[in-house]
Amino acid sequence: MAWSVPCRRLQNIHNSVEQYPAMKKIQVLFHDAGGGHRNAAVALQTVISQQNRGWQVELVQFQELTDHLDVLRKLTGIRIQEQYNTLLRNGWTLGATQLLRVLQTTIRIFHRPLVKLLAGHFRNSDADLLVSVIPHFNQEIAEAWKLVHPDKAFVTLITDIADFPPHFWIESAENQYVICGSEKAAQQARAIGKNATHIFQTSGMILRPDFYLPDNSDPLAIRKELGLQTVLPTGMLLFGGFGSKVMLEIVEQLDAARLPLQLIVICGRNEKLAETFRGRKWNLPLHIVGFTKEVHRLMHAANFLVGKPGPGSVAEAMMRKLPVILECNAWTLPQERYNTEWVREKRVGIVLRNFRQIVGGVKQLLEPATLAEFRRNVAALENRAIFEVPEIFAKLLGEESRPD
């Protein structure tokens, strides 16, 4: 009888464990070539935590996972993500398509070692769902995952508005699900032979959840806080997390034209560029910003955005109801060229051949009728992708959807 009470307690504990099944685990593969992939991974982790879904989300840096097999590092001594970020900082993007194909060919050469390496990692992982927010390596990831976890789902979340085939985002691997942020990407998935059950389409690109928080920010108050005039039209220059040398050329042209304009210039982690701006005298009122997590708030102070046609920058501008001015030419990254087509199709901004035309582009944008049309078109867009993606994950995990 002395053992009966402890035994009953153990049985109660066992019953409680059975009532509360083990927490589902999601592993997200990302890298730091550009800032968008990490941003997507962190946004997913954040929104899932906020929704209290009972999932454990693990972020895995793909570059670190595969470092000793880094295919470009073997050729040049520099990591893939470092090469990419150096190209962006310096504007060395002419011929990027050819470089991209060299990278993809090299990845295919190292296909078997990559699959073996990844399979070894997945054997030590008890994830219930694998998510990739990176391009180029999805065939290797899909094959390795299938070897180790043939009954568990693998999904690629495309962080560009469209794919740049072949072997960029969408692969022929039967076990690859894809999440597309546009009808164009969904069409591309169907064209490669993806079954409809393996294609999910969201209402746009995923953004950080804080873009959706109630915000009563006063644009005029923010301008005053930044030392800008409250009544002047305000543009924002945003060229990714590392800035770009072209920003200096843009401001020089606008400054020389003496347009009735002021600018918020986001230099990101490019402190040298920020120091150059601060060290010059300008006719235009400028507010210079280095790296900041407040871009979403500063956007309230702007009337339009000038930037590179990255999917994240475009999506953030649309979320803040800002028309955009972009350029598209031989220097534009190949995977970002469709983004400019999307802007033209949706009539939400102006696409220039190059930023030497920036003065004319700004004048055109600020014409009252043009600006009003662009604002109406931007306002008509409704992007809820960050909340739609967890519902897709729930489906892939075999869980019920949550009502809105």
Model-derived features: positions:
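Conserved N-terminal ligand/cofactor-binding loop architecture of enzyme catalytic domains
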Residues: A43-S125
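Active-site and donor-binding regions of nucleotide-sugar-utilizing enzymes
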Residues: A40, N90-G193, H198
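A short, well-ordered alpha-helix in the C-terminal region of glycosyltransferases
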Residues: T370-R384
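C-terminal "capping" alpha-helix adjacent to the active site of nucleotide-linked donor transferases
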Residues: R344-R347, R353-T370
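A nucleotide-sugar donor-handling region in carbohydrate enzymes
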Residues: Q176-T234, F239
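Donor-nucleotide binding loops and adjacent catalytic segments primarily
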Residues: S217-A301
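C-terminal alpha-helical cap of glycosyltransferases
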Residues: N383-D404
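Acidic donor-binding loop of glycosyltransferase active sites
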Residues: H300-S313
